[in-house]
A protein has these predicted regions:
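Short beta-alpha connecting loops at secondary-structure transitions
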Residues: 272-278, 327-328, 437-445, 636-643
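Flavin-dependent oxidoreductase catalytic cores
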Residues: 1-404, 408, 412, 416-419, ...
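Flanking helices and flexible, charged tails adjoining ferredoxin-like Fe-S electron-transfer domains
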Residues: 210, 386-396, 400, 419, ...
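N-terminal Rossmann-like dinucleotide/flavin-binding domain of flavoprotein oxidoreductases
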Residues: 435-481, 560-586, 591
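Short, structured coil segments at secondary-structure junctions
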Residues: 301, 324-325, 463, 482, ...
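Conserved acidic residues
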Residues: 60, 168, 256, 327, ...
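Rossmann-like dinucleotide/flavin-binding elements
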Residues: 395-427, 433, 468-480, 489-560, ...
């Protein structure tokens, strides 16, 4: 058994914190994050199981996700409302469960403003001014006095319901480009009345909301603000302005905490930074809470300030608190990946932690599709009420399992089955485990996949999996092994584009392995819309090559999240990668590239390219599966062997297969 860390190891993060009338047992919190678990706009049993498990994992406080204050702020079927009294009873179940585990429970209340175009509820969206959040969006209705009063009343009513439901605190959402931030920002507020123009005027409506909620909940109830420290868009809120806003709000009304984030819902890098993926360095964002904390104290306001954005470990959280950069740290995605990260760290069980890698595939990626959030590294995320923890699912009759293939799916299946008590052997034809993870980590800005790969491999040893590398599997060797069950995780086969002209089209992997063979001027044709082509383009540009990115679609990266796409576009633009959409490469003879303009049907001839990379979807490798049909042993295909998809699906199906065994 591993030795428990003394709390002095995390002497800043693991000490209590007074926040208004509350005391958090430690300074780690789960900040508000949308889950899409709502049912009929009410909190669900799925919410209950999800938050109870994270409270049980040792966190100091949980802030429940964006609770809508008005019907025209719902936006999606799974959004949770607070203005309907029907929310009180299901919320009470959640608050009781979280408090029973020793954590504090707060709720964030929100109006989304112009982000909601009203398609779902057939309502009119509100905003300070008729300025859409993106070129593809619709302008909101500029709010009049009656609209403002309705939104204030919605905040007050929601606060009343949350207090009745047992919430111990409320956070007003003035960040991330939602309605109250839209009033604060000169980018979205161009009014010429008392609610626009000067900083004081732009703050007027958010302050009215704050004062109305404070009057409803009373002076002794914990009430705080989530604030963007910087919008990261020209003409928007800067950190200097955010400092002034925080100090002015604190001078005007009692505020018990500031939760400092950044960004706005703006179709630019601003939005990309909001859920910064593994390609984005989080360090610049971590200066924002420190700046606001200093500004508040300079004005005599000793108010706790929370920091957020890609804190993956308690050590990182402890360091920023120790340095005076924040009083507490929010770790949303880290808790999605590992609900017990606090307890496991303090108890010295670091090798059991599933570390967030900021891939954003299961969290942001699912939100964009209006689906419940998931997690690549934690397939159980969001299924806490349906899937018991593995420790409680021990095999009644251990089976002898043979897993063939040591990529994302095979590694997950092997470690999960072994943890449940099965006798597991894994064969891998290569000398190294990892499969497509090993290709991914060659890419710039994708190296954090190594963390997951190494954690999976370490678990093979921890749970006693027998690993044989350099092992070729065929029907005979599998039959001789005499397993009780076989999982095929042999992956997929790269497809080489068939083009006229006779010139070679490199695959993504070939280009990664031998970029010099492409020469200095590279054409990259992507049919997949996935990460690999994007990161290869950036990698080749980093090597000093001229890169032209051809896409048959109207844009690029249609299968990555908008957050990541916007960040990628910024980097590709900075590295002078040329992007040509609605273009299909039809021929290459080594010198002349023929491209069809899909908008006109005409062909274009491009001279000077020294190499071509064609990104195609892989095909499942079915060859071994066909050989095993005659075996009197259950054979289950998992990962890309079942169907080529993302690592999110590969890991999930590997985990699911092991649970089903």
């Amino acid at each position: 058994m591993q030795e428990r860390f003394a709390e002095t190891e995390f002497s800043h993060a693991m000490v209590p914190l007074a926040v208004g009338n509350l005391t958090f047992r430690n300074r780690i919190l789960v900040p508000a994050h949308t889950t899409n678990f709502g049912v009929n706009h009410l909190p669900s049993e799925r919410h209950l199981a999800y938050h109870r498990e994270r409270a049980r994992g040792g966190v100091g406080a949980i802030i429940f996700e964006s609770i809508r204050v008005h019907a025209n702020s719902l936006g999606r079927p799974q959004a949770v409302c607070g203005f309907d009294p029907a929310c009180i009873e299901p919320f009470r179940k959640i608050t009781d469960a979280v408090k029973a585990e020793g954590a504090r429970i707060l709720g964030q209340i929100i109006h989304l403003g112009r982000q909601v175009e009203g398609d779902f509820e057939r309502t009119v969206s509100f905003g300070p001014s008729p300025i859409p959040w993106a070129t593809s969006a619709l302008p909101p209705r500029p709010m009049d006095r009656a609209d403002m009063d309705a939104v204030i009343e919605g905040h007050v009513l929601t606060a009343r319901h949350l207090v009745a439901a047992g919430f111990e605190g409320i956070e007003l959402q003035m960040a991330h480009g939602h309605l109250l931030q839209q009033f604060l920002s000169p980018l979205s507020n161009t009014r010429d009345d008392a609610y626009g123009g000067s900083a004081e005027n732009r703050m007027r409506f958010p302050l009215e909301v704050l004062q109305a909620v404070r009057a409803e909940v009373g002076r002794d109830f914990c009430l705080g603000i989530r604030l963007s420290g910087d919008e990261y868009v020209e003409g928007g809120i800067t950190i200097d302005q955010a400092e002034e806003t925080a100090a002015a709000l604190a001078a005007a009304e009692k505020i018990d905490f500031f939760n400092v984030s950044h960004s706005a819902y703006h179709a630019s890098y601003s939005l990309a930074s909001q859920m910064a993926d593994m390609a984005i360095d989080p360090e610049p964002f971590r200066s924002l809470p420190a700046r606001i904390r200093i500004a508040l104290r300079d004005e005599g306001h000793d108010i706790p300030v929370f920091a957020v954005c890609r804190f993956n470990t308690l050590a990182e959280a402890d360091a920023i608190i120790a340095a005076g950069g924040a009083d507490a740290v929010g770790m949303a995605r880290a808790h999605l990946a590992e609900p017990a990260i606090v307890n496991k760290t303090v108890e010295g069980r670091m090798n059991e932690i599933r570390t967030c890698i900021a891939c954003n595939q299961g969290c942001a990626g699912m939100l964009e599709k209006n689906l419940p959030i998931r997690c690549l590294v934690n397939p159980r995320a969001g299924l806490e009420g349906e899937w018991a923890e593995l420790a409680a699912t021990g095999a009644q009759q251990p089976k002898r399992l043979l897993v063939i293939g040591g990529g994302p799916a095979g590694l997950e299946a092997a470690r999960t089955a072994a943890e449940r008590g099965h006798i597991v052997t894994l064969w891998e034809k290569h000398q190294n485990l990892g499969g497509q993870f090993r290709d991914a980590i060659k890419m710039p800005k994708r190296a954090e996949f190594r963390t997951l790969m190494e954690e999976q491999i370490a678990d093979l040893g921890r749970f006693g999996v027998t690993v044989v590398t350099g092992k070729h599997a065929d029907a005979g060797s599998i039959a001789d092994f005499a397993a009780d069950a076989v999982f095929l995780a042999t992956g997929s086969i790269p497809v080489r584009a068939e083009l006229a002209g006779g010139g070679k089209a490199f695959t993504i992997v070939e280009a990664l392995d031998d970029p010099a063979a492409l020469g200095s001027d590279v054409a990259l044709f992507d049919r997949t819309g996935e990460w690999a082509a994007l990161t290869l383009a950036e990698h080749l540009a980093d090597l000093g090559k001229k890169v032209t990115f051809f896409s048959p679609a109207g844009g690029i990266a249609w299968r990555t999240t908008i957050y990541s796409t916007l960040a990628n576009l910024k980097r590709l633009r900075e590295k002078k990668v040329r992007i040509a959409t609605l273009r299909k490469v039809t021929a290459f003879d080594g010198k002349i590239l023929t491209v069809e303009d899909l908008s006109t049907g005409e062909s274009e001839l491009h001279m000077g390219f020294t190499g071509l990379v064609a990104a195609e979807h892989n095909f499942a490798d079915q060859s071994l599966f066909q050989q095993l049909r005659h075996l009197d042993v259950p054979v289950r295909q998992i990962g890309d062997n079942l169907a080529p998809r993302t690592a999110l699906e590969a890991v999930y199906h590997g985990h699911l297969a092991a649970r089903d065994l």
